[in-house]
């Protein structure tokens, strides 16, 4: 269904666990879902250096900093998320949800076992765009967050009929996002 309806671009039709001869955190099509990848553009971390508080109704971008993209010995690229910090990223993939399918983005157990929490986020019927991924390092140590590798999984739920009013129909505020999009009211 995902490839026929072009729901995911670019689409990896099989679960990839290796790239360039190195093990990666899995990405691509899985049993009833898709392991989405974190892109190497737009990643930001909340910091008190410039921001005093976070107000989701009046979001101030100065509360975010852009961390350095690092390269591991094996060539893998990653961001280092400090202990007890929260970050925002965006997926490599662009999603286009049909009117009869809703998705739910959840975290991966590989990251959860290392202390990383990925916020559960719906991909409503009719929504399209690159998904903003909200992540938290709950550990007491800095945590590597790899780009172009799996960051979470999307589970798909298909209905027998189209929804009456889609995310697009009601003019959803995050419709068509192509990069990191901050909180809106």
Could you tell me what each predicted segment is?
Residues 1-185:
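Non-catalytic terminal segments and appended small domains
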């Amino acid at each position: 269904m995902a490839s026929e309806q072009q729901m995911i671009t670019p689409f990896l039709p099989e679960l990839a666990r290796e790239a360039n001869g190195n093990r990666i955190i899995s990405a691509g099509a899985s049993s009833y879902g898709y392991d989405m990848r974190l892109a190497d553009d737009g990643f930001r971390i909340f910091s008190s250096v410039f921001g005093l508080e976070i107000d989701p109704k009046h979001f101030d971008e100065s509360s975010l900093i852009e961390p350095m993209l690092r390269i591991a010995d094996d060539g893998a690229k990653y961001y280092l998320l400090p202990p007890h910090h929260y970050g925002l990223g965006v997926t490599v993939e662009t999603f286009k949800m049909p009117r009869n399918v809703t998705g739910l983005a959840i975290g991966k157990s590989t990251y959860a076992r290392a202390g990383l929490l990925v916020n559960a986020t719906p991909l409503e019927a009719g929504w399209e765009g690159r998904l903003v991924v909200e992540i938290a390092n709950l550990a007491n140590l800095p945590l590597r967050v790899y780009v172009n590798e799996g960051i979470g999984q999307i589970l798909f739920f298909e209905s027998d009929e189209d929804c009456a009013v889609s995310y697009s129909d009601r003019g959803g505020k995050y419709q068509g996002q192509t990069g990191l999009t901050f909180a809106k009211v």
